[in-house]
From Swiss-Prot:
Belongs to the acyl carrier protein (ACP) family. It comes from Cereibacter sphaeroides (Rhodobacter sphaeroides). GO terms for biological process: lipid A biosynthetic process. InterPro entries: ACP, ACP-like_sf, PKS_PP-bd, PP-bd_ACP, Ppantetheine_attach_site. The gene is acpP. This is Acyl carrier protein. Keywords: Cytoplasm, Fatty acid biosynthesis, Fatty acid metabolism, Lipid biosynthesis, Lipid metabolism, Phosphopantetheine, Phosphoprotein.
Amino acid sequence: MSDIADRVKKIVVEHLGVEEEKVTETTSFIDDLGADSLDTVELVMAFEEEFGIEIPDDAAETIQTFGDAP
């Protein structure tokens, strides 16, 4: 796994309080990890902060799985 993927996975694990093994490329934040819409907004904000980027709202709405993340 790349450094970026490792960093994304760490954010997901920390923000959603899930086990690292449960986070795969196709893991749905909502369906598989029990996140709600506020959780997904917080994840996007954490990705933006970690990587020093801004994710437009329309792009943020498409981030539903670990594999969709930046």
